[in-house]
Structures are given as C-alpha cells and as structure tokens.
Amino acid sequence: MPEPSKAAPKKEAKKKEEKKEEKKEAPPPQEHKDEAPDDVHPPETPDPEGLFLSKPQNVMVESGRDVTVSARVAGAALPCAPAVKWFKGKWAELGDKSARCRLRHSVDDDKVHTFELTITKVAMGDRGDYRCEVTAKEQKDSCSFSIDVEAPRSSEGNVLQAFKRTGEGKDDTAGELDFSGLLKKREVQVEEKKKKKDEDDQFPPEIWELLKGVTKKSEYERIAFQYGITDLRGMLKRLKKVHVEPKKSEAFIRKLDPAYQVDKGNKIKLVVELSDPDLPLKWYKNGQLLKPSTKYVFENVGLKRILTIHKCSLADDAAYECRVNDEKCFTEVFVKEPPVTVVRGLEDQQVVVGDRVVLEAEVSEEGAQVMWLKDGVDVTRDDAFKYRFKKDGKKHFLIINEAELSDSAHYKIMTNGGESEAELSVEEKQLEVLQDMADLTVKASEQAVFKCEVSDEKVTGRWFRNGVEVKPSKRIHISHNGRFHKLVIDDVRPEDEGDYTFIPDGYALSLSAKLNFLEIKVEYVPKQEPPKIHLDCSGKAAENTIVVVAGNKVRLDVPISGEPAPTVTWKRGDQLFTATEGRVHIDSQADLSSFVIESAERSDEGRYCITVTNPVGEDSATLHVRVVDVPDPPQSVRVTSVGEDWAVLSWEAPPFDGGMPITGYLMERKKKGSMRWMKLNFEVFPDTTYESTKMIEGVFYEMRVFAVNAIGVSQPSLNTQPFMPIAPTSEPTHVVLEDVTDTTATIKWRPPERIGAGGVDGYLVEWCREGSNEWVAANTELVERCGLTARGLPTGERLLFRVISVNMAGKSPPATMAQPVTIREIVERPKIRLPRHLRQTYIRRVGEQVNLVIPFQGKPRPQVTWSREGGALPAEVQTRTSDVDSVFFIRSAARPLSGNYEMRVRIDNMEDCATLRLRVVERPGPPQAVRVMEVWGSNALLQWEPPKDDGNAEISGYTVQKADTRTMEWFTVLEHSRPTRCTVSELVMGNEYRFRVYSENVCGTSQEPATSHNTARIAKEGLTLKMVPYKERDLRAAPQFLTPLVDRSVVAGYTVTLNCAVRGHPKPKVTWLKNSVEIGADPKFLSRHGLGVLSLLIRRPGPFDGGTYGCRAVNEMGEATTECRLDVRVPQ
C-alpha cells in the first residue's frame, strides 16, 4: 500500500468532525425522548419558567488560550433590568477585580440582554464547574456549565510520518520499521511539553494567594471545593514543590534561626552572615528600630553581623527582624523565667470583726505573678470593695479593709515555684474592762467620782443608782472621753448613798460600785478625852483585811479623836513607820491618820498596827493588808500528741497563784520562725490539757500558755519545742497470704492509700486465733518492706492476720485479712523447671567454668539428690541447693567430667527427675594418612582418614592447604569440607605440590596438620577446544495478560485510566473495546502502549461512559482478551 499523504488525514479528520457536529445538532428521535443523548455532557433541558434564552455551554480549551462564554436573557417581560453574577464552584464570585476575567453586557432593540465572561490565558487551575446567576428583583434563575482545559496539541499532524523503513521499497513489507526518528522527536517534544506545563500549570492569582496563607490542612479541601478545583492531588503536589523550593537570598548567606530561648538575666547573641560586608543592615524589635546602647550591642566580625542583648528581661521577649535593603529575616526570642519561690511566707493572724487585715508575703522576683487562694478557691479581683491586692517590689499584700466572720479561712499564695499558707481567724468583738470602778466612802459636801475604762473608744453607756437611771444635773456630771467613762457627784448628800452601775450599750456587761456616806455628828467633848480610834476592829480578821492589787496605791485612812491631840504611830511587827515622804509614808491630820503605800508590792503584805496615845490614855487597832497579783506563768508546757491537723497541749499550774485562785488559762500558737502569735481561746480554759485544731499538716508550730486569775493574766510560759502536726497513715491495703508452712506464714500487702507528710516508718504484723481477741505481735521491730514471714506459729490452728503501719504520729488503723489461715504445709508436687538451653547437650570447652542454676518447685521443701550415670558425683563437681533452686558447679571443666548427670527432687512418695547431658570438648587431633591418590591435568585427588582424637566432639570439617615444593608457601584451597577426600584444581603445570590437612570441630581446628607423604607433579600437556553445537531457541509466544483489567468505580468529571500488562512475541496488536465494540479515534479516549504496559485514558467520563471495557491482543501465535467493569457515579 502506498504511503498516505499528509492532507488525507486532515480531510478525514474534518469529515469526522462534521459528522460528529451533525450528530450533535440532529434532534433526538421521538421514541427516545426520555433518554439522554450519547454525549459526554448532555445538554440541559431549559426550564420553561426560566429567565435564560440561551445558557452558557460546556467548553474545552487548550491551556494558554482565551475562552469566552455567554448567556442571553429576555428583558422585555422583566420588571427591571436583569443583573448577572458569575461564580466558580459554588461561592467564588468572578469580577473585574481579577486581571484575567472580563465581563461584558449589551442590550439589543428587542431588550435581549447578552452577558459575556472572558478568561484570558486559561491555566490548568481554571478547570472546573462554573455557575451563572441572573436576578431581576424577586425573580431569580441560575445555570451551570464547565470549562475543561487540556494541554496544547502537538504540531505533528500524523504520528505515522515519524516512522521510517530500512528498505528501499515503499510498500508496507519493505524492510523493518525504524523508530529512531520518532524517539528523537519525542524527546524534544516531551521537554517542550514539560517546560510548557511548568509555565502554564499555574493557579489563578487570587487562589494562589489563598493557598499560600493556609495553615490547616482542612482548608485546602474547602478552597478546592469553593473554587471548583477538581484535581486536588495535583494542587497539593504543586503547592508542596513550591514550599520545598526556598527562594535563595541574595543578601544573606545564613539567616536567623526561627526561634531562640534564653534564661532571664543572661545574654543572647543573634547572628546573621551577609554575602557582602558593605551591605547596610538594621535591627528591629517588634517593628521598632534598635539603636546601639549598653543593652543592645552591635558587632561586625567579617561577614557576620551580631546583635548581643545583655541582661534579658521579660520585656525582651519579642519578635526581632533583620533588614538588608528589601530583604528581611525574622526570629522570636523567648525569655525563660526561673521559678519564683516564696522567700517569706504568710503568718497566721487573729483579728476581731471590723479590723483591717494585711496578709504579706515576699517572693524571689520582682513583678512576679502570684495567685491568692481562700480555702482552695481563687480570690478574684472582682470584689474590689472587699479585697485589695498590692505589690511593693518583691512583697505582695492581700488587704481586707473590714474583716467579717466569713473571712475566717486558710489563705494561700501560690507562685510557679512555691506556695505559703496561713490561717486567718476572725472573732466576734469582745468588750474588755480595762479599769473597774471602786467603792467610795465620802463625807457630806465632798465630791464622789466613779471612773471606769473599757477597750472600745466608741462604746457609750448609761449610769444607774439602785436600778434607776442617773440623769445629769447641776450636781451630777456624766462624761465620756475615749475609753474612759466618768460620773461625778458634787456636794454629796445622804440621799446619794447607794449602788451605782455603768452598763455599756449593746453589751451584756455591767460595772458596779457602792457609795458610802460618812455622816459626821458634832458632840460636845470635854477638854480631857482619852484617844480613840474610830474603827470597828472587833470582828473577824477577814473583815479587817484590806485587799490590794500589786502596783496599786494603798491608803489606810483611820479617824482618830482625843483631847489633847493624840500621838499616832504605825508599825508592822517590829518595823516602825515615821516617814512623811517616799513610797511608804504617813499623812497626819487633826482627826485623821493615813498610812499610804504608793505602789503595793508582795512584800508589803502583813499586819499593820496603829497606836494613838495622849496623857489621858491609849488606843490601838490592827489592820490586815493583803497584796494580790497576777499569777506566775504555767510550768512544764509540752505537746503530748499530734494528729493530721490537731495537737494536744498539757501543762502544770503555776507555783504562785498571785494570792487569788486560778480561774483558767489562755493559749496561743504561731508558726516556727514567725513573730505573730494567734490566740486559741478568748474565754478562759479551766483544764490543764487543751486540744488545738485547724492546723496545717507538715508545718512546724510553737505554743505557749498564760495563767489567769481575778487580777489579770500572767506572763507567757516558755514556748513548747517546735512540733509538726502529722496524722497516722490510713490502713495498709490488699493484705494477702503468699505462702504457708507448718510453722510459718508469709504475708504481703500494699502501702496505705493516704500516707501524709510523716511518711511510713515501718509496719507491724499481728496474729490471733480465730474467735479470740488476743493479738500477738509477729515482729518486734518495724519492717520497712511490704512483706513479712511470721515464724513460730501453732501448727494446725486457724489464725487471723492484720497489718498496722507506723510513723512518727503513731499507729494506723489495722488492715485485717478477710479470711483466717490454716497453718499447715500445702503439699505441692515436686517439679524441676529445667531451662530450655539445658534440655539438649550442654557443651563446654576444657578449662572453662560450669555454673548452672536449675530451679524447681514443691512444698514442703523437696529433697534434692544428684548422681552421674547412677553413681556418685566426681570430686570436681559441686552442688548447692536452696529452697527454690539447685546450683551445679565445676570450677575447671575436663573431658573426663563429660556424661549424663541426673537431678532428682523428692517429697514423700512423689518424685521428679531431669537429666543434664554435659560434654566437655577440645580441639581435635590431626587427620591420618593424607596421600595424593590421583593426578590428572591441573587437578589432584587427595584422600585421608579421620583423626584418632576428635576432641570429644563431632568433626565438623577439614581445611586443606597446598604448597609448591620450591617455595613451600602454604595457601588454603578448601575450608569446612566434611568428606575425607577432595579434588584440588587449578594447579600450575610444571610445578610439584605438597598438601596438608587440618581437622575441625566446635572448638576450632587442630593444633598440628597432617601432611601428605607423596606429592603431585602437574605435567605439561597440549589443550584441545571442543565447541558445543548451538541450538537456536524459539522465542515465539502467544499473547498473555500478566495484569488483567480491574473493575473501577469513579466520579463523573474526573479523568480515569484503565491499565493492564501483556506479553507475547512477536509484539501483539492491541485493540480497546467498549461493550464489545472497538473504540475508534475518539479524542475522548487516549490509548498508550509502552514495554508491555497498556493504558486507556478516559477524559472527564460521564454517566454514559460506564460499561464493560476490554483489551484484545493478537499476534500470529494466538489471541488474548481481558475485560473490566467501569461504573461512573454522579455526585449528589
């Protein structure tokens, strides 16, 4: 057949295109109205109520060209001019803002609106589905279409033109096909296509910018769906290549690292390296230009530019930038803070309602962030009227302006490296009497003053006389000055006598005193009158006793009379008082003698005697002065026991009670090292043992005690030794029995769930008989591990066991075993657990040590015996047996010790045995009778006999060496050969050889070789080459599919490829079939065949492209066919 001309294919292609267009334009037959036409994209049936006269059609365009789609809308029937929007995908609106999209709108005389969308230089990223939406007030309509972009077509019109034939004839049979021209052109074509694809396979600029800014992987799928990108995998590959290929910097050789970290207070260096030392460089911090200073130091070292930041603080934690002209590099500096610790912690405080509370703590760093907690709950700054937070350098304050009862709690300050806790106790405000009123005895016309002092300056009150309120008048004055309340009565009269009471407002408290009126009767006295003391001292001594508080003033006013005026003397025992000044003095008047002690002391207590004398007579009286004081401090204050948050304090009464009975005691406590004491009770405590609660476990405390009597409070006692509230642990858990014998039981347990700050010092194990309550200690000393073997138990008894954990706080509650245990040996059949490596022959070399541990089991303890082949063990073999294993030991192995050793374990009539096969080996002796049996050509046959001594091991092989008799240099020709004969080849002609052989076993080769007695002489002879006839092989074979087609299910609109592999010789002719019909030159299908791999590419398949596809291969030897099913799914 003559070679077809170039024009013929073009004409045929034009005819096919015309026929295809005719088929496409021809209306479908009436009887198949409901079926879709056989096309890739079936035309959409227009909605009869739609606004479109013509809708945009699906378009296929080559990459790099412009494409235009148009839509026509009838505007005559619309209430207003229509407006059109173009979308890619579902939401991406196309507009004039993009440089590659142009929109046009025109109207003709019939009010038909034409809208056009033009995309210039179409790229592969423009492929996808598009939507056109038209609106006119409330009317709305839309339609969809697609744009498919294909690679630019080759300029070659006919592939057959690339083929050449080697023959001179022009028919098909002349010569063989020459593919060289095609391959050369294809190489150029592939390079051009690849270059063109790299240039054209770009995304639109707006999509590309979106893809560059994506941080989450899920965003890629959303963008692809939004902009109609169907080739998601290709998009990701392209984007990955762009990310992997960093842009090479022209200014920087080495840029900054992405991030740096430095500890607070240290310095850090940021280093870049420039390509040119003359380039200008600037440093920025958070966008602000940095200038050289003592903190920021700039250095130039060759091409390196260094920024040094000294004494980094939290303010230096920022983003830094280095600029060289238009190029930049960035980094972040993270300043790491050291953990902030609490240097001085909080202190316990005790206040009353309304007081101002300041909780103060000091931390290790200024400006540190702290957290305040109240009973474990964060104290927020929302309650600004109640809580106030203050910072002063390293000190932090929590201020409560007016304390309330609800503020009583444990307060904690927390930092990232420590914490401190303190207790705040708010009590009801108590009114204290600082100075009580005293009884008064006044004369007529004198002034009476009642005065008292209370603890609160703001407290007011009222005065009463015999239950009737006293009102101010000209003679009666009531005053209130700070803590002092005063009632003054001028010109006292007899009716003013009575009981006076002061009652503070709002308190159930009253202060009382008595006013005695001393009436003076004027009588006629003769000139001579004996002296007389006007005191009634005839009663009991208690009535004549005057009680005074130490430190107060004592004034004994004694009325006297007599004519002439008597002489007054005061005595205490033999001591005579005459002084008129000083701490103790006497004031004398005509009718009154006063004995005054300015500040009473304990030594002033005693009997005082006053004597008055004149010439007429003498009189005397005795007064008892009793000085009372606050008691001495309590003695022997100590802490007797502690708990998790409590401690028991005990003490002894003071040796001196101050002259008044002890009414009770007051207690205080503080944290060790603190200066602030906190009261534990406001009302006196009568006993000498007190339990303090609400303490913090693990914190050291100190306590002290005050004694109280009617006079006041004593000095504090000595502080107790520092103690720590620690609770006993909870009971141990999971108490179980592990083992039991006739007299022992092994108990195991787990540590307590709650241990606390005191830890666990050890455990006690106790046992008792079932039904009894008498517990017997199994161990006298604490055991630290969680297990104990109790020994000396009664055999056959049922016993209960319990475990108690002990720490410095005491014993925990016991954990008792649930069931009683019968103390009797549990019989367990003896069994030897022979290790796996000892179940076969155990091989050791001579001189090595043998140390084998063979475990066994059985209860009670089995009896273990060893024997060697029924006899006793050699003296060199030693055994040691424990409760659970036996040790077989040989210090230095020798060959006579090889053999079978038997181990037996026996319990009563039960027995188990195991055999240990021991073999002690060494190197073998040399082989025997090595001789050359035959010599031919360049070969020699050697033969020998096994060695007499095999080293007590099997001979694993032989090593053969040869040597030329002239040089006697030995060369190994064979190793690990098991037969006792071998052939040595490739010997040099004309030489004479001697051979030697080594024997070999598991220990190695023999010490000495065995040398052959005779030699092998290789004679020189001529060589003859005999050619083997060559038989040509028939390589022809029928076609056979190595990889058949596989059923596929794809989504409509996504390109699919069907692949298979075939072999055969001569090369088979391949035909693709669809539904048993041959696929012609349809541009929708592209078939490829390379090195036996066949592929059929189906572009953008539609629902009607589904069916059965087949591939048929035919050559002169036969035919082969493979088929598959292709299902095309339409997305919902």
Swiss-Prot record:
Entry-linked InterPro entries: FN3_dom, FN3_sf, Ig-like_dom, Ig-like_dom_sf, Ig-like_fold, Ig_I-set, Ig_sub, Ig_sub2
Biased composition (Basic and acidic residues): 9-44
Residue ranges occupied by any Ig-like C2-type domain in the UniProt entry: 48-149, 249-338, 339-429, 430-530, 531-630, 830-923, 1039-1132
Record has DNA-binding as a keyword: no
Disordered: region residues: 1-59
Keyword hit for Repeat: yes
Record-level GO BP terms: cell adhesion; sarcomere organization; skeletal muscle myosin thick filament assembly
Swiss-Prot/TrEMBL keywords: Actin-binding, Cell adhesion, Immunoglobulin domain, Muscle protein, Repeat, Thick filament
SUPFAM superfamilies: Fibronectin type III, Immunoglobulin
GO MF term set: actin binding
Fibronectin type-III domain residues: 633-729, 731-826, 926-1022
GO-annotated cellular components: A band; C zone; M band; myosin filament
Cross-referenced PANTHER family: TITIN, ZORMIN, ISOFORM J
Function recorded in the entry: Thick filament-associated protein located in the crossbridge region of vertebrate striated muscle a bands. In vitro it binds MHC, F-actin and native thin filaments, and modifies the activity of actin-activated myosin ATPase. It may modulate muscle contraction or may play a more structural role.
Family statement: Belongs to the immunoglobulin superfamily. MyBP family.
Full protein name: Myosin-binding protein C, fast-type
Species: Gallus gallus
Lineage of the organism: Eukaryota, Metazoa, Chordata, Craniata, Vertebrata
